[in-house]
Curated annotation (Swiss-Prot):
EC number: 2.3.1.89
CDD domains documented for this protein: LbH_THP_succinylT
HAMAP family: DapH
Gene Ontology terms describing biological process: diaminopimelate biosynthetic process; lysine biosynthetic process via diaminopimelate
Pfam family, one: DapH_N
Protein name, per record: 2,3,4,5-tetrahydropyridine-2,6-dicarboxylate N-acetyltransferase
PANTHER family: 2,3,4,5-TETRAHYDROPYRIDINE-2,6-DICARBOXYLATE N-ACETYLTRANSFERASE, ACETYLTRANSFERASE
Length: 241
């Protein structure tokens, strides 16, 4: 099994793809077992419960063999699982200094900055970075190695393209204080400059200069960010921290 360490080159999409291909695939399950059965805890099985009821954690193939071997002793059982042949585990979020809402999916090797907010249904892929005080709104997608700066808002349903499929050596970068409207799409390799605003529903195919507003399909510069725009797009600090 190949483990992608902190020293591995996440800038190379082919290295990430190799890791995914060669990583040991996992189908972890949780089994609730009722019956007169003795289950010994091993390196492959984690067991809780009492004489006639057990909760067992392990890989699907191991747990299924256990159930088949003790079929005559089991009255009822139920299996719960949420993935199949998964190559990348989810990020351990329990000690992050950020707000992570239920239903967010954040894969391993992601960096989440202080006071960031990840809303329900957001998906953040391997190698992405979310800066301090930034919000990834509901159902937004941050692709592999997407770089999100500080004080950024990525609107609901927006898509920040990743470096995988099609492979790209250059990640999408949103610099500090950028606002991306709902359902906008930022394509591979695009850099959105400091303080820029991407209007809702736009498709951004080329770099966006700092402090500009872009809109449309494909997105074009429509104005320079002014005081009125800053007022309409300012972040709410009470939602952070």
């Amino acid at each position: 099994m190949i483990i992608l360490s902190t020293n591995d080159n996440l800038t190379n999409p082919y290295e990430i793809a190799r890791y995914i291909k060669e990583a040991k695939k996992s189908t972890p399950v949780r089994a609730y077992i009722q019956g007169n059965i003795e289950i010994e805890e091993t390196e492959e099985l984690e067991v809780y419960g009492c004489d006639n009821f057990k909760i067992v954690f392990g890989e699907l193939d191991v747990v299924e063999k256990l159930i088949e071997a003790n079929e005559d002793k089991i009255k009822h059982y139920r299996l719960e699982y949420d993935r199949r042949n998964s190559a990348i585990p989810l990020l351990d979020i329990k000690h992050l200094d950020a707000r992570i809402e239920p239903g967010a999916i954040i894969r391993d090797k992601v960096k989440i900055g202080k006071n960031a907010v990840i809303m329900m249904g957001a998906v953040i892929n391997i190698g992405a970075e979310i800066g301090e005080n930034s919000m990834i709104d509901m159902n937004a997608v941050i692709g592999a190695r997407g770089i999100i700066g500080k004080n950024v808002h990525v609107g609901a349903g927006a898509v920040i393209a990743g470096v995988l499929e099609p492979p790209s050596s250059v990640p999408v970068v949103l610099e500090d204080n950028v606002l991306v409207g709902a359902n906008a799409v930022i394509l591979e390799g695009v850099r959105v400059g400091h303080g820029a605003v991407v209007a809702a529903g736009s498709v951004v195919t080329e770099d966006v200069p700092p402090n500009t507003v872009v809109a449309g399909v494909p997105a074009k510069i429509v104005k320079i960010v002014d005081d009125k725009t800053r007022e309409k797009t300012k972040l709410m600090e009470d939602l952070r921290g």
